[in-house]
Amino acid sequence: MTLRYDVGIINPFLDAVVGVLGMMASMEVTLGKPYINSKRSAAGDVTGTIGISGTVDGIMSLTLDEPVILRIVNNMLAENYTEINDEIADAVGELTNMIAGQARQDLTKQGMTLKSSTPTVIIGKGHRISHITSAPILAIPFSTPEGSLVVEVSFESEGTEPA
């Protein structure tokens, strides 16, 4: 496999999660150990996915436990949501877009030219989505007192072999 996930790729996504959640939701997250997702799917209560294209093509997904997204949105909007609804789904799409956008901005400083698609949001307790990519999927887990969230990133490059 020719594609390696070095800190130049990983750090923009780490920084984006920490920055966006800190700024928008006054929320601190604890980084877990990044790993390659060999199951090639994401499982959780709500997921936002976004396509990234340009110098490299890829995807980013943000998967959250229900208590985590409820706290984020309640902090952002000064509300008291108790279940996932349309407003929560909209917020997941916006968070996905903001995290991908911040990471893209940092990757642009490294000489990449990237743009994003419109996010798609998948809702359902314990849902599982399959990533449609032949490239390795890097999972970056974070924890909060309410539960976990995972950002998954996969970039295709010339010569990338199916995992």
What do these predicted regions represent?
Residues M1-A163:
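N-terminal auxiliary interaction/assembly segments of multi-subunit proteins
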